[in-house]
């Protein structure tokens, strides 16, 4: 079994979050026999050029996206999502992705400390030609409702997204399990419920591993980065539950 393509991968260019440089991630993907590799840094396209260059050098297809916070029109958080650019369309997907990131960094002064995009603005950018796919994963508003075992709330949240993103191919549910304790974020239970929601609503679903590092041992470095991001000493904030957020081979996925 080979060729699993990871579609949610943060590199070391995701400040205080990702661990591994894009080039090393791409090398590992190529070594696994994967024909394409994605990068989805948080809040920007910071590692995209390095990623694309490494992919072209090794003869595999680059996939580029971004992990962004989403806001409602009042500036309230709707969780985070992954946005992937479509390829083979004359650069439309890349152009849309660049516009999305630019809008995310141009929030009104009242919420300027955040990087994020209003769902209505995202919908406007993807309304006609599409060009990107939005993945709603465990830390989206849909995923958080699923985590709370609020099925009606999850369906309502998903319907709000479907109302905004009506262009075919612009919306999918992201299934992630880091084998955490049942009932907690990134658990098998949450992943199963997300898949059930996708099936019930006829929404496409994709499996990812929400990758932060290359190998399990790199989780220690991720803990240090989390400490810097939270501005808290280790032990004073909720840590990673385990070391599962690595670039797993297909058999492990």
Identify the meaning behind each predicted range.
Residues 1-253:
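Phosphodiester-processing cores and adjacent nucleic acid-binding clamps
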